[in-house]
Swiss-Prot record:
Organism: Neosartorya fischeri (strain ATCC 1020 / DSM 3700 / CBS 544.65 / FGSC A1164 / JCM 1740 / NRRL 181 / WB 181) (Aspergillus fischerianus)
Topological type in the membrane: Multi-pass membrane protein
UniProt protein name: Tryprostatin B 6-hydroxylase
UniProt keyword Iron, yes or no: yes
PANTHER family recorded: CYTOCHROME P450 (PTHR24305), L-ORNITHINE-N5-MONOOXYGENASE (EUROFUNG) (PTHR24305:SF112)
Reactions listed under catalytic activity: tryprostatin B + reduced [NADPH--hemoprotein reductase] + O2 = 6-hydroxytryprostatin B + oxidized [NADPH--hemoprotein reductase] + H2O + H(+)
Subcellular localization(s) per the UniProt record: Membrane
GO biological process: alkaloid metabolic process; small molecule biosynthetic process
E.C. number: 1.14.14.118
Pathway(s) served: Mycotoxin biosynthesis
Amino acid sequence: MPSVMKCGYLATAGLIGICIHLWYFRYGEHHLYPWRYVRFHLCLTMGVSALLYAKKPPQYTLSPGDLVKDTCLLMVTYLIGLFTSLLLYRTLFHPLRQIRGPWAAKVSSFWLSFRLRRGPSFRILHELHEEYGPVVRVGPSEVSIIHPEAIGIIYGPNSRCSKNAFYDNGHPMMSLHSYRDRTAHDQRRRVWSAGFGDRALRGYEQRMRVYRQKLFQRLEERADAESTINISQWFNFYSYDTMGDLAFARSFDMLDASRNHWAVDMLMHGMIGYRYLFPSWFFRLLATMPSLSNDWHKFIGFATDTMLRRLREQVGVPDIFASLLAPLNGRDPTDDERNMLMGDAMLIITAGSDTTATSLTSIVYELARRPDEVDKLRAEIEPIEADSDGEYQHDTLAKLPHLNGFINEAFRLHSPIPGVIPRKTPPEGIHVKDIFIPGNMTVFSPQWSMGRSEAAYVDPAIFNPERWYKHIDLVKEKSVFAPFSIGPYSCIGKPLAMMNIRTTVARLIMRFDVRFPEGEDGIRWMDAADEHFAMGIHQMPVVLTRRH
């Protein structure tokens, strides 16, 4: 092929790459079906090869090797044009170009994913904020903000922000958590709300007490043996057994077996990908590769079978799923409804189990460090009469200021969702103080950093439960405190979680003295906490001693 012709083809290929970026990929969302783009470019490659062969001058012989070489050269030139345009746009012309942050973060979202090999997002983001200030560009279109005003603007009741592409990672499986359309979300939330009224919560409490009894039996056995207990593991067993029952009317039996159910192991392995905050298109690409997502799909298969069994069962004491099944009026669900029920069941298990276990573990960590606070809690709880099983009525615990203050302090410093809860800015953009964030950008405000912000709290490094009821001036911006998020997308399970946490903590401190093993202070285990959207504290060794 003549060199002049080849140069013309190369210039055209590069120009096409530039145009595709500027006129297609710059606009809208393209994450739902990533394999379509893979197939498109494979077809494009074959089309280019066929075109080169058809257009070759008659006097030239084009060997298969030359055809492959010329095709690859044109495709590489096309990609160079596309990515050069992308690079120049993101670094020089992007609407976020004035926001400070690492240079590589401007170029690719994979920069943050790569950085997360060093640790969980909440710690990495905290380091970035210490270096760059309260507003940091952490990706081409992603901004982390820790100004106190940001919480209300991004997540609050009157926020104009919506959910971004992250919430499509499980598509077509849907859940209350993943609805991006506000109207559809509100409609589904009304269905869920029927399962979280006072009457429903009292029913769930009956079911939860069964597993709490088992938990304390196991803890007492180990306390009598004077052995070190990984309290995090036992809270995990308890939480998954409880939420499995509430989701499917069927426990995972982890407290009985004293080990993880195989399906829970599959779930934990399958959730690892969430730690790295991959772009949604890449996450969905990986999720279709059996070698990388086999564990996740095994859990989905188990959960699907269990859900279908639950559809055919009648339960005496209603579970959460009973409220979700009510709109069906006894008929079989459609495919879309089945995907929705499957997603909601997964949400009950993952959101309810991980966050509760982490919250209880972080509270025990603080209890073991602060015996003076334990004395205050016992003095507050002792006037309340427990039943024969050692259980307390939640209504009485809910009114105790120091117990609530202690739990709030643990949430402030160890939020169960400590890092990225992404939102998409409205087309007109948002203002946070004197910073303008343009429309259709991803923003978030990590709770782990907000809980340590001197702009929101006086002496934020000091653990002081009284800041929540006695010295309220120590909380400068109460709206910043959002362990369950706030606004229309806030956690609907907060009343259930708080009931579970209060009753478990009260019984624990009245039944046991809690301390760390000799030579331990728990700090290294908190520093080793992982994250896959929710925080995970895998180890927290303590020694429990019966009080009486």
